[in-house]
């Protein structure tokens, strides 16, 4: 009876039933932790995918804006090339105007019409470019506001709230896991201490049994049974030790898995931080690029405005030139009329000169005849000589020259005056002056 009571006390002290139930509960908790780790991994992958989808939308909008800006830059370069070509054409036309004297008015009018058409086209292009720049500015402001709203909504959107809740759950589960690890370590240490206590109790029981064996040699059979029971209990204790070792191995494996999961979480957090930093840097670079492009576009707009002002000034100058050309045309017409009148006057003067020449030749011939007559004194007497002298005085060439000197001829070009007696000098002067 005493042996049976000692056996029951040993069994109660060992607590085999509680150990088996605790091992099952530990396995169930380990499986739950595995499932929770898998769910956390899936949630993190979903977070990554959602973050990538969120980052792609503004990037596509910004890429479209960049393509539009490049297209505008190509148009600007084409317009600059066209302007250079037109300026070259204007220079060639000016040279042609300088070279050609008879076709000045028609060529200038055609050039003015072309320039007016070109100025209208440039104004239309400038207005279109201004509208496009304003549209781009509005789009850029909308994109920047959208990026700001997306950055602000990152903390308030439903998906991010779910992800944050999942992260909080993961952190809480990690804390529970740490508490469970600590509890398991305390449990294992308690089991080991209990095993040590049981071994001490077994030693004490062995010593007590030996003492009882010495005291009661008659109860050999009961002692053998007790020894068998003790051996069975020792086997059970060894089994328990094996189970504890298995639990320790499993605990180490679970702790390794938990450490790996922690490392993965840390790496994912680092990656998310790096992605956020890279996205912020990209946004900053894009904003800087957009600002630079806006500054360039503003400079281009200013240059176009200056060019338009220059064009307007050129138009004013061309209008002044048109007026001057019209005045020159009128003056040329007036000069033509003056030339025609002068030519008519010259024809009249030449006719008069011819008449005067004829008269002079006649007078010279008559003078020669008279001189020849005066050379024969025998045929004339004194009275005849007096008559002839009187007639000579009346019709002398000096008098004729004096009559001719009273009428004056003028050069139509420079206004130089010559008497009619110097008609030959006037003709030489006209040849020199008009050449």
UniProtKB/Swiss-Prot annotation:
The keyword Cytoplasm belongs to this UniProt entry's keyword annotation: yes
Coiled-coil intervals, chain numbering: 18-140, 185-373
Compositionally biased spans, kind Basic and acidic residues: 26-49, 213-222
Principal location class: cytoplasm
Knocked-out gene: effects: Morpholino knockdown of the protein increases jaw cartilage disorganization, decreases the size of brain structures and the lateral area and convolution of proximal renal tubules at 4 days post-fertilization (dpf). Embryos with CRISPR-induced cep55l null mutations display altered craniofacial patterning and atrophy of the proximal renal tubules.
Residues making up the signal peptide according to the UniProt record: none
Top-level division of the source organism's lineage: Eukaryota
Family matches, as InterPro entries: CEP55 (IPR038926), EABR (IPR022008)
GO cellular component, one term: centriole
Keywords from the named record: Coiled coil, Cytoplasm, Cytoskeleton, Developmental protein
One matching Pfam family: EABR
Region Disordered, residue ranges: 1-63, 213-239, 268-287
Location in or out of the cell: Cytoplasm; Cytoplasm, Cytoskeleton, Microtubule organizing center, Centrosome, Centriole; Cytoplasm, Cytoskeleton, Microtubule organizing center, Centrosome; Cleavage furrow
GO biological process assignments: cerebellum development; cranial skeletal system development; establishment of protein localization; mitotic cytokinesis; regulation of phosphatidylinositol 3-kinase/protein kinase B signal transduction
Function of the molecule: Plays a role in mitotic exit and cytokinesis. Recruits PDCD6IP and TSG101 to midbody during cytokinesis. Required for successful completion of cytokinesis. Not required for microtubule nucleation. Plays a role in the development of the brain and kidney.
PANTHER family with a match to the protein in the record: CENTROSOMAL PROTEIN OF 55 KDA (PTHR31838:SF1)
Name of protein: Centrosomal protein of 55 kDa
Source organism: Danio rerio
